[in-house]
A protein has these predicted regions:
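AAA+ ATPase active-site-proximal loops
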Residues: 32, 185-218
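Acidic/proline- and glycine-rich, intrinsically disordered low-complexity segments
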Residues: 69-93
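A short, aliphatic-rich beta-strand micro-motif
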Residues: 117-125
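Signal-transmission linkers at sensory-effector interfaces
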Residues: 1-30, 41, 61-62, 176-186
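Signal-transducing coupling segments at domain and membrane junctions
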Residues: 59, 68-70, 96-118
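Conserved ASCE P-loop NTPase core motifs with emphasis on AAA+ ATPases
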Residues: 164-195
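Regulatory loop-to-helix N-cap segments in sensory/regulatory domains
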Residues: 2-7, 138-154
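Amphipathic alpha-helical "output/dimerization" segments
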Residues: 14, 126, 144-163
Length: 218
């Protein structure tokens, strides 16, 4: 159950908790999940996602209220739907009722038909570049102030830019390492001479690798 804080100090409470998480959490993705948990407890957030930009694509990096399959479906092109539009323009967007807006794609398929909730999406900017988005589905009642919520999310997006950038860099470094390892493995398998030459020590290492490698029947 959301522990909604109705006081005028809502923003300060949220930002204090998020700032504490940034100081104490070193894992980028875990930090993003922690931030979404804060928004859930404090803002009547039903679902929330951080997307990360890779080239012309946006992929969900962290979420609250989505399962693994729903996260995998949350794949957008820059410029596509509300999330893609925010990533393309660098400007926030608010939909007061997603059931009445045809631009809302519901790509994750988490929203029920006719479900009346608001959707707020803000860009995450690092070094003047949009590197991702933060979006939430929010229940709406007579006390809801969507403009206030948007401004708060923009502040959150600004202060987590470094964390999302670090997560993006880690993804890129892992991908580069995997590609390099695959290239090295292919060379060792198909043309070891290019790497080993006539060095007797390297020849011994290569013989050891071949000896310990599993056979195709294993």
């Amino acid at each position: 159950m959301n522990e909604i804080n109705r006081s005028p100090d809502l923003e300060m409470v949220v930002l204090k908790e998020i700032s504490s998480a940034i100081v104490n959490e070193r894992n980028g993705t875990a930090l993003l999940r922690h931030i979404l948990d804060v928004l859930y407890r404090r803002m009547k957030m039903l679902r929330g996602t951080f997307t990360i930009r890779r080239g012309n694509d946006l992929m969900i990096e962290a979420s609250h209220g989505l399962d693994e399959q729903e996260m995998k479906r949350g794949h957008y092109h820059v410029g596509e739907g509300i999330t893609g539009h925010v990533a393309e323009t660098g400007r926030p967007h608010v939909i007061e009722d997603i059931s009445r807006d045809s631009r809302f794609l519901n790509r994750t398929r988490t929203r029920k038909s006719g479900e009346k909730v608001a959707f707020i999406c803000v860009p995450i900017i690092h070094l003047q570049q949009v590197i991702g988005t933060l979006s939430i589905d929010r229940a709406v009642d007579r006390d809801t102030d969507l403009e206030r919520d948007q401004k708060l999310l923009e502040i959150v997006g600004n202060i987590v830019g470094d964390a999302l950038a670090a997560s993006l860099q880690a993804h890129e470094e892992r991908a580069a390492l995997v590609a390099e390892n695959e290239k090295l493995r292919e060379l060792l398998t198909t043309n070891p001479g290019e790497l080993i030459g006539n060095c007797s020590t390297m020849l011994q290492v290569y013989d050891c690798l071949l000896y310990t490698s599993p056979s195709p029947r294993d």
